[in-house]
Amino acid sequence: MVNEYKRIVLLTGLMGINDHDFRMVKSLLSKELKLNRMQDQYDRVKIADLMEDKFPKDAGVDQLIKLYKQIPGLGDIANKLKNEKAKAKRTRTGKRKTAAKRQRQEEPSTSQPMSTTNEDAEPESGRSTPDTQVAQLSLPTASRRNQAIQISPTIASSSGQTSSRSSETLQSIIQSPKTPKRPSSSILDPPVSSGTASSSAQALGVPLATIAKRQRLKNVPKEPSEENGHQQGSKKVMVLKVTEPFSYDVTEEKMFHATVATETEFFRVKVFDIVLKEKFIPNKVLTISNYVGCNGFINIYSASSVSEVNDGEPMNIPLSLRKSANRTPKINYLCSKKRGIFVNGVFTVCKKEEKWNYICYEIGDDTGMMEVEVYGRLTNIACNPGDKLRLICFKLIPDEEKAQLRSTTHSNMQVIKAKN
């Protein structure tokens, strides 16, 4: 039960909030968790481990509920935590009741052997009415008739009149006058196999792949699709782009970013197990499962969440979808977007200004200018006006006066030097 509570704490409580709120939660829980200076840099997974040790009863679910009710904007998550905890309790209680009921049902069956004597069988047959006997006979008879129709279609077609009269006679015999039975749907509407559909499409001269592709190309998404919370189902995707692993905190924890796509949408992915770098190869098809959606990203923490696909079925990713997933957004487009989204792209550096704890770059394109604030480890990367910056996972911060990009914990950037 504690493991279930920890799942709620991590996937709903900690992964469901942004980085700013997470730092606030760590600060408010620092005394209870007795965080030292190094532990102040712990990520969500490690904080969940500490909470499990500190609050063995419920892994800290109640503590998060109390905190989130006091933090503006987190009331909905507090209610969600409360509901999921109640649901976990009900599930646990239901499993106990089911186990007890199954145990009670098994006890008499083991103590009383089944009787097969004629004395026990005769009273049962004596209670059967003519109607029930007809109903009992009708099922095997109809089953044999169904088998006859399905197994020998040539015989039925060669003697159509005889089959018609026989089926009508048999129909009148097996049907009860009180409760007439409808014929099986498998007889009336024979299933259409994939081979039949394929041959029909080919007869029209239009390949199925072309039809599906045309349907997929109608609406090409401009933004990555988002999923929220823990996702246990599987998703078949193709890898479009992947970065090299990099250290993202003072404890030298490593991760890498990737862009993947289905045939209709694309996703941004954060991978926190660098062993998976061997599987994330461009144009490779993978199945991902048991992941967490948060802040517009799919977060993968375990190698067991990714498996290679070798079913021989190719994925046809439209070229327009590939271009959309790799496109650098225009600055005027970013200025019109809601704040809080994360941005990838290559931008030209027009100006550089070093502040006391960060570097401010001014980037530009043919639609406008925008500031980029770079903090922490990324300030050590040498970049000058005229160079290009490849930004990965930079946040469009809330600012009423002007749009601005800012680096976060999982941001990274690369410099493309200007040609002399």
UniProtKB/Swiss-Prot annotation:
SUPFAM superfamilies for the chain: HIN-2000 domain-like (SSF159141)
Residue span, Pyrin domain: 1-87
Start-end of Basic residues biased regions: 87-102
Biased composition annotated in UniProt, kind: Low complexity: 152-169
Boundaries of every HIN-200 domain copy: 219-416
Disulfide-linked positions: none
Coiled coil: none
Gene3D superfamilies for the chain: Death Domain, Fas, Nucleic acid-binding proteins
Composition skew (Basic and acidic residues), residue ranges: 220-229
Protein's UniProt name: Pyrin and HIN domain-containing protein 1
Originating organism: Mus musculus (Mouse)
Gene from which the chain derives: Pyhin1
